[in-house]
Every structure is written in structure tokens, then in C-alpha cells.
Curated annotation (Swiss-Prot):
Record's protein name: Ribosomal RNA large subunit methyltransferase H
Organism this protein belongs to: Vibrio campbellii (strain ATCC BAA-1116)
Record family assignment: Belongs to the RNA methyltransferase RlmH family.
MF terms (GO), sorted A to Z: rRNA (pseudouridine-N3-)-methyltransferase activity
Stored Gene3D superfamilies: 3.40.1280.10
């Protein structure tokens, strides 16, 4: 099973890339974590936000591999603690499909992305900066994997 983070935004600061890569390289070969960056639409004073969201959503959905489980990252989604995320990860592995996790831009996700989702996950009730979300996601998924693999990374 491959896990793919599909995120709106490119040209992240170096610390974001380094943080994400630190956790990405820890994943086992049979569960690679990859990042697909979707260019953000140009936003300005007179920007058509609905149109920008639609375009970003189309690009995100076209990046999802055929047959992959789609999980949206959205505040109203399910709130999983670490053991629950580990259970989800195990269920995804047993399902046998790749997993694509969609991370929206400043205005969130397009309605089409939400409609296409198999699941919706709320990372936090807090509004987090999108660059930081990439690192938190990578670490959270790695920690969940470590629980399923009985790896000593996670401690209760």
C-alpha cells in the first residue's frame, strides 16, 4: 500500500521539506509515503475563489491513482487519536488499496473533493498552517505505522 499526500501549495520553506523527508524516509518499503504538490491558484483582491477551488480540486482528483481510497483532511471529519489512527492504517492495509490524503489550500477543499472522499479526517479543531500540516501528517502516519509494527518509536 502506498500513501500519497496530495497537497495544494508548492515552494515550501526548506524546514518543511526537511521535516517531511525526515519522516518519509522512515516508512517501510512496502508502505511508501509520497507527496504530490498541486499549484495553488492565484489569489488576489478580485479572485474568483469558487473557481480557484474548483481548479485545485480537479487537479487534486486527477492526481489520485485509479482505485485509491480518498481521505480528505477537513475540520468536520472524524477525530482519531493515535491508537485509532493506527487501527485505521491497519484497516487501509487490509483493504489493499493505495491511500490518497487530500490537503486543501487556504480556503480548504473543493466540494468535488469532499464528495469523492471515502473518509474525512480532522487532524485538529485548530487551524494549522498548511506547511506544518505536511510534517504533522507524516509524523502521525509514521507513529501509527510504528504501533502496527510493534516498533519502539511510540511510547504510551
Amino acid at each position: 500500500m502506498k500513501i500519497q499526500l496530495i497537497a495544494v501549495g508548492t515552494k515550501m520553506p526548506k524546514w518543511v521539506e526537511e521535516g517531511f523527508q525526515e519522516y518519509r524516509r522512515r516508512f517501510p518499503h512496502d508502505m511508501p509515503l509520497e507527496l504530490v504538490e498541486i499549484p495553488a491558484g492565484k489569489r488576489g483582491k478580485n479572485a474568483d475563489i469558487a473557481r480557484i477551488l474548483q481548479k485545485e480540486g480537479e487537479a487534486m482528483l486527477s492526481a489520485v491513482p485509479k482505485g485509491a481510497r480518498i481521505v480528505t483532511l477537513d475540520i468536520p471529519g472524524k477525530k482519531w487519536d493515535t491508537p485509532q489512527l493506527a487501527e485505521q492504517l491497519e484497516a487501509w492495509k487490509l483493504d489493499g488499496r493505495d491511500v490518497s490524503i487530500l490537503i486543501g489550500g487556504p480556503e480548504g477543499l473543493a466540494p468535488a473533493c469532499k464528495a469523492a472522499a471515502d473518509q474525512s479526517w480532522s487532524l485538529s479543531a485548530l487551524t494549522l498552517p498548511h506547511p506544518l500540516v505536511r510534517i504533522v501528517m507524516a509524523e502521525s502516519l509514521y507513529r501509527a505505522w510504528s504501533i502496527t509494527a510493534n516498533h519502539p518509536y511510540h511510547r504510551e
